[in-house]
Amino acid sequence: MSKLFWAMLSFITRLPVPRRWSQGLDFEHYSRGIITFPLIGLLLGAISGLVFMVLQAWCGAPLAALFSVLVLVLMTGGFHLDGLADTCDGVFSARSRDRMLEIMRDSRLGTHGGLALIFVVLAKILVLSELALRGEPILASLAAACAVSRGTAALLMYRHRYAREEGLGNVFIGKIDGRQTCVTLGLAAIFAAVLLPGMHGVAAMVVTMVAIFILGQLLKRTLGGQTGDTLGAAIELGELVFLLALL
């Protein structure tokens, strides 16, 4: 289990992980690491939340929110934001399914992708600022949001097909079973309930699950399946939806 955690941490983040900690784990077995996604999200959110807490007293909530979101982006290397941008460029191109997938592979940033990045990043900053002004616990909120968003991404992997012939997303999409999905969602729910008691966190997770499930069905109908880019988009949108649900 420890090898899986370190392998997943180095796979979906840019945090430094010694190679020997995950050595010997075959890439084809990475799908088993889905159950570590909520824990990795918890770690990322906690670090981002700590940055917010340290900076809030010095420069106020808006700037603290800006830097906490920036730290979150840096820790993931913009991996999920890139998926969001590519997904929006493809889906909103109003082309054929094959052409959409080609556009999503293009490394150039299009208008729709750029607008999506601006909207999501700005929305996160504004929502975090508002939550802070309302006296909500930002560290707990961010940790729960990142854990839940990565946990609910399993909804786009379970019983979905991969829309392309090959790619990184193929490691997870269609490769996880019902037990892994339930464990992943269960861990995310536990983190949300513990960090944000009074059913506040669980209610926000339910809203997030519904949103991500609907997103998955829409993408399935549009693209014929899921890709690594759509998983990244789901994680980014999941974070935002969860935080919005806390308002």
UniProtKB/Swiss-Prot annotation:
It is an enzyme of class 2 (transferase). The chain crosses the membrane at residues 34-54, 59-79, 113-133, 138-158, 194-214. Coiled coil: none annotated. The keyword ATP-binding does not apply. InterPro entries: CobS (IPR003805). Pathway: Cofactor biosynthesis; adenosylcobalamin biosynthesis; adenosylcobalamin from cob(II)yrinate a,c-diamide: step 7/7. It catalyses: alpha-ribazole + adenosylcob(III)inamide-GDP = adenosylcob(III)alamin + GMP + H(+); alpha-ribazole 5'-phosphate + adenosylcob(III)inamide-GDP = adenosylcob(III)alamin 5'-phosphate + GMP + H(+). It is found in: Cell inner membrane. Disulfide bonds: none annotated. It comes from the Bacteria. Its cofactor is Mg(2+). Its EC number is 2.7.8.26. It is a multi-pass membrane protein. GO terms for molecular function: adenosylcobinamide-GDP ribazoletransferase activity; cobalamin 5'-phosphate synthase activity. One of its GO terms (biological process) is cobalamin biosynthetic process. Pfam families: CobS (PF02654). The keyword Ribonucleoprotein does not apply. One of its GO terms (cellular component) is plasma membrane. NCBIfam families: cobS. Belongs to the CobS family. Joins adenosylcobinamide-GDP and alpha-ribazole to generate adenosylcobalamin (Ado-cobalamin). Also synthesizes adenosylcobalamin 5'-phosphate from adenosylcobinamide-GDP and alpha-ribazole 5'-phosphate. This is Adenosylcobinamide-GDP ribazoletransferase. It comes from Escherichia coli O157:H7.
